[in-house]
A protein has these predicted regions:
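Hydrophobic alpha-helical membrane segments
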Residues: 1-244
């Protein structure tokens, strides 16, 4: 319990310090990235260019995630907004994120194939219950088991299968603290649309509120990941004694 309390308190303290220095600029930049992402999805996924637009939107989303990765790296590691070498890091993160997306896509294909026969076939549940179960399991796989892949990309500087392996090892070693500290972010992400599409209509005010709060909890996750991935329980025990 002492270790868990220390992880929470230090992560929150480090997050507050980063927000105190560059909080407004950070939230505005993250909001801009989110807005551009939504705008691109709406524009390129409709009308006559829908088929070609799907491909264009895919690369735009990766580019925007690359921008977000650079912003998050600077805020998590150095408590500052990026202002140099932006082009290099965009290209760097773009490749890592694209490779990771490809691996996740393969995992989703395998999951869809398995869930079709197991959930929709063997379980004999009705269509609604089968769909809810399928979405819930996909949420657990993508957001909890593999949920730290983005932090692995922008903090550990890896991508593709290496990022997925890192996420698996990380959750195995830090399941309880990472799950607990990720709960607010996952709730906000769920409320913003995502996995609830088709099940629940989320009002516009809630979407706006989540767009403001999500960057804060993304930063909290990043700070927690940095602490947990760079230390063991023994090291954190020493840090507690030293700081006290």
């Amino acid at each position: 319990m002492r270790d868990l309390k220390y992880v929470f308190s230090k992560s929150i303290k480090d997050t507050a310090l980063a927000l105190k220095k560059n909080g407004l600029a950070f939230i505005l930049l993250c909001g801009l990235v989110s807005f551009l992402s939504s705008l691109a999805s709406v524009f390129f996924a409709s009308g006559l260019i829908a088929n070609l637009g799907y491909i264009i939107n895919y690369f735009i989303q990766i580019l925007l995630l690359s921008v977000l990765a650079k912003i998050m790296n600077n805020m998590v590691v150095a408590n500052r907004i990026p202002n140099r070498d932006f082009k290099y890091y965009l290209e760097h993160y773009f490749i890592n994120i694209m490779n990771t997306f490809f691996v996740i896509y393969i995992i989703e294909l395998i999951y869809q194939f398995a869930s079709y026969y197991i959930i929709y076939g063997v379980s004999k549940l009705d269509l609604t219950k089968s769909r809810i179960l399928s979405v819930t399991l996909l949420f657990i796989i993508e957001e909890m088991i593999l949920g730290s892949w983005f932090e692995a990309v922008y903090i550990d500087d890896i991508g593709g299968l290496a990022a997925i392996k890192r996420a698996l090892n990380f959750i195995k070693e830090n399941f309880i603290p990472w799950t607990l500290i990720s709960v607010p972010y996952l709730l906000l992400k769920t409320l913003s649309g995502g996995y609830l599409n088709g099940f629940l209509s989320v009002p516009m005010w809630a979407r706006v509120l989540t767009s403001i709060l999500m960057p804060v909890f993304m930063l909290l996750r990043g700070k927690a990941y940095l602490l947990l991935s760079r230390s063991t329980k023994r090291k954190r025990k020493f840090m507690m004694e030293y700081e006290n």
